[in-house]
UniProtKB/Swiss-Prot annotation:
Binding partners and assembly: Binds tmRNA. The SmpB-tmRNA complex binds to stalled ribosomes.
SUPFAM superfamilies according to UniProt: Small protein B (SmpB)
Protein's UniProt name: SsrA-binding protein
Subcellular location: Cytoplasm
GO CC entries: cytosol
Lineage: Bacteria, Pseudomonadati, Pseudomonadota, Gammaproteobacteria, Enterobacterales
Name of encoding gene: smpB
Function: Required for rescue of stalled ribosomes mediated by trans-translation. Binds to tmRNA RNA (also known as SsrA or 10Sa RNA, 363 nucleotides in this organism), required for stable binding of tmRNA to ribosomes. tmRNA and SmpB together mimic tRNA shape, replacing the anticodon stem-loop with SmpB. tmRNA is encoded by the ssrA gene; the 2 termini fold to resemble tRNA(Ala) and it encodes a 'tag peptide', a short internal open reading frame. Able to recruit charged tmRNA to ribosomes. Does not play a role in transcription, processing or Ala-aminoacylation of tmRNA.
Assigned protein family: Belongs to the SmpB family.
């Protein structure tokens, strides 16, 4: 009988796209796998990824991640030509792809990458169907966030 591996401390999250939640209303989230090359996996293990400008395009019945930047490590990629911003294929079920096609074809909707993380030994990306926010929506979100902080401060001082 084999022993269970000890859980490694640390976060499984590689990269977050905080700007996406500020710029868009996220209506639905999907988890997708990524088709990666060897040097990309090694760079992701080192945490050298940025998905702040990334988005998903659907074409020919497949989904592709554009704009994600995975910086190559100097020691990992000496004999391979590395393109840090290459297009990466997303691995989704046909049912999930059909759902994405149906939602994105509506006016004003897009698909953005929300986070990049490890699930067991596999690299996953969380994508969301998003609708752009107007300026007044962003302001109301900031006011709501500030009110939550003020409310927490008031409650903390009330218990003293």
């Amino acid at each position: 009988m084999t022993k269970k591996k000890a859980h490694k401390p640390g976060s499984a999250t590689i990269a977050l796209n905080k700007r996406a939640r500020h710029e868009y209303f996220i209506e639905e989230e999907f988890e997708a796998g990524l088709a990666l090359q060897g040097w990309e996996v090694k760079s992701l293990r080192a945490g050298k990824a940025n998905i702040s400008d990334s988005y998903v395009l659907l074409r020919d019945g497949e989904a592709f991640l554009f704009g994600a930047n995975i910086t190559p490590m100097a020691v990992a990629s000496t004999h391979v030509v590395c393109d840090p911003t290459r297009t990466r294929k997303l691995l989704l079920n046909q049912r999930e792809l059909d759902s994405l096609y149906g939602r994105v074809n509506r006016e004003g909707y897009t698909v953005v990458a929300l986070s990049l993380y490890w699930k067991n030994a596999w690299c996953k990306v969380k994508i969301g169907v998003a609708k752009g926010k107007k300026q007044h929506d962003k302001r109301s979100d900031i006011k709501e966030r500030e009110w939550q902080v003020d409310k927490a401060r008031i409650m903390k001082n009330a218990h003293r």
